[in-house]
Each structure stands twice: as C-alpha cells, then as structure tokens.
C-alpha cells in the first residue's frame, strides 16, 4: 500500500491516490466524511473551519461502495478557493491583480523562509506556505479512513485523544476505566477538546481561551492507541523494516509534530530495567502475553500483540496574531512576520491526524505481511496466522 497527496491550501481541490488496497473492501463516502468532520471539530480551531465543509468524492477505484483493487482517487473541494481563485489561478500568468497578497515576511517556525530558499520562490513565499499548510492533512485523514476500514476487517481498532494542551492535562490513569477503545471513543469524542474527562476538558478550554485573548498559540500532546494487531508485524532484520520506526516517521511527518514516544517513552529513561520490561506469561487460551505494556506494543520493531501506544508532541502554531520578529526578503529590513488566518491551537485536530497516520502504517504492515488481491483472502490469511501464533 502506498499513497500520495496533492493540492494547495487555497487551491481548488485536495487530492489523494492510494494504491494496494485489495478488492472487495466496502467503503462509503460516509466512512470518510465522518473522519473528516472529526478533523474539523475541536476547541481552538479558526475561521477556516467555518468556511469549509469537507466531504470526499471517490473518483476511481471504487464501484458501488466497494474497492476494485485498482488505484483509489479521492478528492475534497476547497470551498475557500472561491475567495482565492485569482490569486491561486494555475492557468493565468502573474499580474498586478492576482499577486496582491504576496508573502514577503516569513513566519518563525514555519516553512516559509527555508522553503523559499530551497525552491527559489524569491518572488512570493505563498508558493511555499500553500503546500506546507496543514490543510494537506485533510487527505491524510481521508486515506487514514480507508486504512481504518481495512483494519476493522481483522479486528483492529485505532483511536486518538488529547493528553494535554499547554499546562492543562488529562489524567492518563483514567484509561484504566475503559474495557475497549469504543468505550474510550465515546468519552473523548464527547468533549470539544478530546480530553479524557470533564475536568481536563474545562481546564484545556481555559488555556485555549487565555491563549486566544493573548493573540498567541499553544501546543500540546496527543496519544494514539491501537488494539487487535497480530503479533510479529514489522521486523528486526533491518532498520527500515521496524514498524515502530515507520510509525515514528509518520508521526513526526505531520505538520507541527516535533517528538514521538512509544508506551512509557521518555519516562522509561529514568527507570531501571525491571521497572520497564514487559514480563512474559502464557495460558492455554491466550498463548503468550505480557503483564504490562511499558514498551507500547513493540519489541525489536515488531508488534507484540499488546496495545500499540504512541504519543506525539505538537508545537504551537507558528502563525501569531501578535507576530514575531522577521525580515522582509525584498528589502532585508526588520519587520513583524506576515499574518495568515490560523487556529489558536490544532492539538484537538492533531489527535485525529495522528490516529490516521498510525492507521495507515498499520494497514501497510498488514498488507505487507498478508498480501492478497481480495479482502476475504486477506482475512483468511490473517486468521490462519493468528491460530499459528496462538499455538506457538
């Protein structure tokens, strides 16, 4: 399985093409639109979300809500393009009229300046920010929806939520209350902040409100949990086959993500071995299992069968309504950075995006191990493998 996305933030469309999805997978627009709506929701989002109503269209690879085995093309229309049609016109030459909203004062923390240098976009840094914008993650969530649908066929569930926004934190001890991810999902999706309880929800809202009043932005952390993965996906034989490494790459590849950990993560660095390693047990029904999950579901780059637990660190959004020091790339004079419409925080949306990226990497791993042209054949292979593992 592989995919590519295309599109600019204020261009006409966002597009994704997916290859490698087996034939016979039932997938509807509603399956994808539900995930796109989750991405748009969340406390601290900006005015752009009031303009857009993200809905997907399948252009290829799906017939009668069933995949054909051929490349799947999806697109989402950018409603805001109506306000930018001249400025983002692909088929018209540059004129004084359609270059009015040039960006010449790069924002600290954004791709503006370095991207302009790399691609020689000396005339207008908008050529950088239109693609480097997190608007592109719309299509990663859409691809993730397809991946989640495939994973659900073999009993794998994936869910993301917010750990903290600034100093306001969810109590992770709350996780022990839930028997499965569906119970957790009902709770966290019931809060605008995707927090674990009402107390954390209110505290996070207070932080976001204060940040907005201060014309500032704020970051946080999100966590993704996946359950039901077969044992032994990924491999120890080469660095580039380790599944946790692939997930780490996918998480840090999301806009604004600056760190990733698995299980106990960085806290494990302050502990001793007998406090961290997940002891091994066996019973006739379950086969081998672990007594804890401090390593986040991975050993040697391979899934252990325990829950996969991934956390990502999200920096504050670099577009500030009280802009920071910058330099005009034309005059080289000191100026405040450009202002683009933005969110106060995108941590609530980041939980959904991280969930999608984990799902994509897990789906890739499943299809690498159980390569099949049809979804039913894939499920048969998984069932045989699970039984083999159980009897080991």
Swiss-Prot record:
NCBIfam families: aroC, PRK05382.1. It comes from the Bacteria. Homotetramer. It comes from Leuconostoc mesenteroides subsp. mesenteroides (strain ATCC 8293 / DSM 20343 / BCRC 11652 / CCM 1803 / JCM 6124 / NCDO 523 / NBRC 100496 / NCIMB 8023 / NCTC 12954 / NRRL B-1118 / 37Y). It is an enzyme of class 4 (lyase). It catalyses: 5-O-(1-carboxyvinyl)-3-phosphoshikimate = chorismate + phosphate. This reaction introduces a second double bond into the aromatic ring system. One of its GO terms (cellular component) is cytosol. Its cofactor is FMNH2. FMN binds at residues 131-133, 255-256, 300, 315-319, 341. PROSITE patterns: CHORISMATE_SYNTHASE_2 (PS00788). This is Chorismate synthase. Pathway: Metabolic intermediate biosynthesis; chorismate biosynthesis; chorismate from D-erythrose 4-phosphate and phosphoenolpyruvate: step 7/7. Keywords: Amino-acid biosynthesis, Aromatic amino acid biosynthesis, FAD, Flavoprotein, FMN, Lyase, NADP. Its EC number is 4.2.3.5. Belongs to the chorismate synthase family. NADP(+) binds at residues 39, 45. The gene is aroC. Reduced FMN (FMNH(2)). InterPro entries: Chorismate_synth (IPR000453), Chorismate_synth_AroC_sf (IPR035904), Chorismate_synthase_CS (IPR020541).
């Amino acid at each position: 399985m592989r995919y590519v996305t295309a599109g600019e933030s204020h261009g006409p469309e966002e597009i994704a093409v997916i290859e490698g999805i087996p034939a016979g997978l039932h997938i509807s627009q509603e399956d994808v639109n539900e995930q796109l709506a989750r991405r748009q929701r969340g406390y601290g989002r900006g005015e752009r979300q009031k303009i857009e109503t993200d809905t997907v269209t399948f252009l290829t690879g799906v017939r009668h809500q069933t995949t054909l085995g051929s490349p799947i093309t999806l697109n989402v229309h950018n409603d805001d393009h109506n306000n930018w049609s001249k400025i983002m016109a692909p088929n018209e030459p540059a004129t004084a009229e359609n270059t009015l909203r040039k960006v010449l004062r790069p924002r600290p923390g954004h791709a503006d300046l370095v991207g302009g240098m790399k691609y020689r976009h000396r005339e207008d840094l908008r050529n950088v920010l239109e693609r480097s914008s997190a608007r592109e993650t719309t299509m990663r969530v859409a691809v993730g929806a397809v991946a989640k649908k495939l994973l659900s066929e073999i009993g794998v569930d994936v869910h993301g939520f917010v750990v903290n926004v600034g100093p306001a934190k969810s109590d992770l001890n709350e996780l022990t209350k839930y028997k499965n991810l569906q119970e957790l999902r009902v709770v966290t999706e019931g809060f605008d902040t995707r927090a674990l309880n009402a107390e954390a929800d209110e505290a996070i809202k207070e932080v976001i409100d204060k940040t907005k009043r201060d014309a500032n932005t704020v970051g946080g952390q999100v966590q993704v949990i996946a359950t039901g993965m077969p044992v032994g996906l990924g491999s120890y034989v080469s660095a580039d086959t380790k599944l946790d490494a692939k997930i780490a790459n996918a998480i840090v590849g999301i806009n604004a993500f600056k760190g990733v950990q698995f299980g106990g993560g960085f806290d494990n660095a302050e502990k001793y071995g007998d406090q961290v390693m997940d002891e091994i047990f066996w019973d006739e029904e379950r086969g081998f299992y672990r007594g804890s999950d401090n390593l986040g579901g991975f050993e040697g780059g391979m899934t252990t069968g325990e829950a996969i637990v991934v956390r990502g660190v999200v920096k504050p959004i670099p577009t500030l309504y009280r802009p920071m020091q910058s330099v005009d790339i034309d005059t080289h004079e000191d100026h405040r950075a450009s202002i683009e419409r933005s969110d106060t925080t995108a941590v609530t949306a980041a939980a959904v995006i991280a969930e999608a990226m984990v799902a994509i990497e897990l789906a890739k791993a499943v299809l690498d191990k159980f390569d099949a042209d049809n979804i039913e054949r894939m499920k048969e292979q998984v069932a045989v493998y699970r039984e083999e593992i159980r009897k080991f």
